[in-house]
Amino acid sequence: MSPFEGGDGIDVWITEACTNIKTFERDELFDLLATETRVWWAELFEAQSEAIDKLTSIMNEAATTQDGCLEFGQKGAQRISIRGKRIYAYQLVYWVGNALLPSAQDVVRHKCHNRRCINPSHLTHGSQADNRLDELERRS
């Protein structure tokens, strides 16, 4: 169960994210699958305090909606800058919070269909094809 669903809130989730990111280690598989993007994410995970500070900042700036979404930004999916790169806030929340290195095919999906949402319990990952199927289901 997500800490948000259990009512414990952002602080518990941030603590969980800290635990997850501290367990990150590069291994032989990382070396075999290394790309420029994966190396960038690995370096972000290794800069733990910077990653967690940015994560905490955006989580605390988000506003809760009636649907339980944590909306960050005014219009559309909000981009943030970190370590010289611009990424979507929801990507930072999902990949850093779970200490998962995305591959080129991985995307963060919104179960709530709200691209402004950064609520970790509303986010999951999959492929671009999964994302398209989500959109078709939402429209039907």
Can you say where each PLM-predicted feature lies in the sequence?
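Conserved recognition-core residues within compact binding domains
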Residues: 2-107, 114-140
